[in-house]
């Protein structure tokens, strides 16, 4: 059986990849980062509140504390989009779209820059979102496959195929 995908590595796709990494391979580190971020936000709020209770005038320090808190909150709520934005900036020329062919032995991903053959043993985690299948190789690397462009079979057939070939269950990411 042979499955084919044509995928664009755009903001939407890279956000799905970032979310899959955050919720699987990076889960423990992400949780620690979120706790640290929220502690900094709470500290900024406490510092501003303490100065207000002491009836001290508003200073540049208060403005900076407020700014840090707002920026951290924005990043904490849009973490996947921010990571996708920076990942898109790091894409090498000619790698913004890929055609992938999955066969029994391996799969090949072809971009304008190169064609690369991958073996299923290298996959650490298989994920699925509403629009993409995601194969993760490490904390830093993964690939997305657009379900809308799947040819050679159905999404259900591909799920069975990729689960069998990688030996990994599929993690469903919302």
Feature annotation, model-predicted:
Residues 76-117:
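Conserved beta-hairpin
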Residues 3, 116-118, 143:
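Short beta-strand segments
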Residues 132-174:
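A membrane-cytosol interface segment of integral membrane proteins
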Residues 107-108, 116-131:
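Phosphoinositide-dependent membrane-docking surfaces
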Residues 97-99, 124-125, 134:
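Short, surface-exposed charged micro-motifs
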